[in-house]
Amino acid sequence: MSNRFAVILAAGKGTRMKSKLYKVLHPVCGKPMVQHVVDQVSQLGLQKLVTVVGHGAEMVQEQLGNVSEFALQAEQLGTAHAVDQAASVLANEEGTTLVICGDTPLITAETMEALLQQHKEAGAMATVLTAYIEEPAGYGRIVRNENGHVEKIVEHKDANEKELAIKEINTGTYCFDNKALFASLSKVSNDNVQGEYYLPDVIEILKNEGHIVSAYQTEHFDETLGVNDRVALSQAEIIMKNRINRKNMVNGVTIIDPSNTYISADAIIGSDTVLHPGTIIEGNTVIGSDCEIGPHTVIRDSEIGDRTTIRQSTVHDSKLGTEVSVGPFAHIRPDSVIGDEVRVGNFVEIKKTVFGNRSKASHLSYIGDAQVGEDVNLGCGSITVNYDGKNKFKTVIGNGVFIGCNSNLVAPVTVEDGAYVAAGSTITENVPSKALSVARARQVNKEDYVDQLLNKKKS
């Protein structure tokens, strides 16, 4: 197999997005558009990948890191001009170069591989990825000769009446013989309505020089969708969402209502897990097998063990063990590690806490900056008082501890193994192992007080 290279065009302004965020960084199913493209082309066995950047170059470089080399298009003078910016990296290379836009997040490695294979089998100098659509307005048209070979590509604004009637369109993805590509770029003129250097003109140049120009027509037009505004962004989101949901269902995940379930492109979900409506799974989340998630649950960048149930709750940047029960209406905040067989009940908030195996906080509690041992019971209304207005402090609760209802543990404080804290206590000092700590005012009953008070008011 000959050397393979790719150029991703990601320098456009994206003015139609009407956004401060650089266009190719707008997310589709939780991942920037250009990252989707890079992830797919990276499966093609490339020797070099060059991303052409312009506006927001630093942000794109930060997003992609060292998986790509970069070329700067300081002034946007057209797609041919953009590709030419990669000349310093690629111009002297022997092989085949794929050119693709960074705002086409739906393109798949399978389609690009088919394009490359067509290019090789045809012995072509250039091969165009095309599609057939009923309403081609706005797209460049594929003009073929009497033998069915690609003659040229005409941009919509430059097309005559006959050419506008053509329904085979240019998707903006190509592959070229690398040296032929860069030799032709210098011959491209900007004598057109837009005054730009169009990459499709390379097709006509190569054709006029007697080279073979081939085309591969994809049956999956949705893969070629270019995102130029928020409407197209929403269309891409829907298509990608459906693709991800279908993949998970084929792999053994039950999704009760796919139209109301959102799964990020990088999430991994085990078989026999059930996702209820309103479930949103974001980022690099990993969910085990036989889990039940939702309804109305958000999980972001977290790891969920097998046979865990999360109902109407939020989990962010945390790790949950096996057979954990969360919710309804619980909130597990970042940097929490929840053990196996744990119960986190309704209206419980846990933040930056290690919560041991088989421990329970079943209702109305806040556990923050804490280390909770195994087999601990935190009664309703248990609070770790971790913040003094300036600093956060840690609470340590040992194994087998029982915390009574409506208790405050004022950090820094330690409750040692096997200790009990009486309901209603405010603990400000360490509690020894197996001790009972009572820290509340003694109850005083005043006999006949109410009658005396009422009689006094009457008089």
Curated annotation (Swiss-Prot):
Which gene name does the record give?
Answer: glmU
Q: How is the cofactor bound?
A: Binds 1 Mg(2+) ion per subunit.
State whether keyword Protein biosynthesis applies: no
Q: What is its main location?
A: cytoplasm
Q: Which reaction does it catalyse?
A: alpha-D-glucosamine 1-phosphate + acetyl-CoA = N-acetyl-alpha-D-glucosamine 1-phosphate + CoA + H(+); N-acetyl-alpha-D-glucosamine 1-phosphate + UTP + H(+) = UDP-N-acetyl-alpha-D-glucosamine + diphosphate
Q: Which residues form the active site?
A: H363
Q: Where is this region: Pyrophosphorylase?
A: 1-230
Protein name per the record? Bifunctional protein GlmU
List the residue ranges of the region (Linker): 231-251
Question: Which pathway does this polypeptide act in?
Answer: Nucleotide-sugar biosynthesis; UDP-N-acetyl-alpha-D-glucosamine biosynthesis; N-acetyl-alpha-D-glucosamine 1-phosphate from alpha-D-glucosamine 6-phosphate (route II): step 2/2; Nucleotide-sugar biosynthesis; UDP-N-acetyl-alpha-D-glucosamine biosynthesis; UDP-N-acetyl-alpha-D-glucosamine from N-acetyl-alpha-D-glucosamine 1-phosphate: step 1/1; Bacterial outer membrane biogenesis; LPS lipid A biosynthesis
